[in-house]
Amino acid sequence: MAMVTGGWGDPGGDTNGVDKAGGSYPRATEDDSASPPGATSDAEPGDEERPGLQVDCVVCGDKSSGKHYGVFTCEGCKSFFKRSIRRNLSYTCRSNRDCQIDQHHRNQCQYCRLKKCFRVGMRKEAVQRGRIPHALPGPAACSPPGATGVEPFTGPPVSELIAQLLRAEPYPAAGRFGGGGAVLGIDNVCELAARLLFSTVEWARHAPFFPELPAADQVALLRLSWSELFVLNAAQAALPLHTAPLLAAAGLHAAPMAAERAVAFMDQVRAFQEQVDKLGRLQVDAAEYGCLKAIALFTPDACGLSDPAHVESLQEKAQVALTEYVRAQYPSQPQRFGRLLLRLPALRAVPASLISQLFFMRLVGKTPIETLIRDMLLSGSTFNWPYGSG
């Protein structure tokens, strides 16, 4: 069951449950599919009827009447979505924001129904314009809002670039390393950290545009950005982090630090954990992680680049891709893009030396991680750890 309020917003946001337009709560028994499947009185120019084609509504599973606002839906879900957008409505879930939406329960919670409409790809802008473009956005449509002096996006369409970033992932999606929240031992922490480092190099090797760069540029970019990529991977993989095993892995129990240095070190540990936690609270999805990692990877500040301007243009492509993706997928979270982008400077503030000491001291000893990354990248193999502690 959901309450309706004036002022359309993203289903992920909270509302106060008051109808600002002065209307009453919608009746839970009202069925939005009252109009017959063949009705055309409210047809939009962007709707595509499919007579004779048996396709289910992707929102509720009822029989669809065609393609509406980008996806196949029934007349009921089409009308509900159009009404929600045109009347600028938003809803509040009275349960846990995970209500079942099917043919029999679709009218019980408007919040979760609208949330599912967006999740399956229904387009808010298609309602506002009365039609939906069939082609992918071209270069002119891919510039970030208000951008000046930014090179237009001339690479693959935004959706294709993100698809390439997702395909570059060497492991399944978030939570891939499990852990279930249990406190891991030192060896487990180090093993998971090694796998995260492997995945960082493997992802970069298959990321769009990166393989075409000169080998020296590839090494320079990874040597500079590996710690940021590691933190992003740790957050994406939901790596279970607990202070005690981290400190043990860093060798602090065997060789205690001076008090002043230990306090500073603990502050850095907390800063690292805080960055991972903040990414978790933002509920960053896989596509956003891919874009953030690409923005971090293509840093024109890396030393010795043969063409820093080209690397900067690649970074801009990833940033534009993130802009367009967030705008399309989270249309009523206008601050989301800024919040995501602000994570990157904070990640860079986490010292690479801290990550090395926390996670890799037992595995590589005094061997610099940057040397290890260079060797893995140039050898073409990340799953053969060539170093021992010493």
From Swiss-Prot:
PROSITE patterns: NR_LBD, NUCLEAR_REC_DBD_1, NUCLEAR_REC_DBD_2
Region (Disordered): 1-50
NR C4-type ZnF: 57-77, 93-117
Keyword check for Lyase: no
Biological process per Gene Ontology, one example term: entrainment of circadian clock by photoperiod
Record's compositionally biased regions (Gly residues): 1-15
Keywords for this protein: DNA-binding, Metal-binding, Nucleus, Phosphoprotein, Receptor, Repressor, Transcription, Transcription regulation, Zinc, Zinc-finger
Subcellular location: Nucleus
Function: Transcription factor predominantly involved in transcriptional repression. Binds to promoter/enhancer response elements that contain the imperfect 5'-AGGTCA-3' direct or inverted repeats with various spacings which are also recognized by other nuclear hormone receptors. Involved in modulation of hormonal responses. Represses transcriptional activity of the lutropin-choriogonadotropic hormone receptor/LHCGR gene, the renin/REN gene and the oxytocin-neurophysin/OXT gene.
Quaternary state and interactors: Binds DNA as dimer; homodimer and heterodimer with NR2F2 and probably NR2F1. Interacts with THRB.
Designated name of the protein: Nuclear receptor subfamily 2 group F member 6
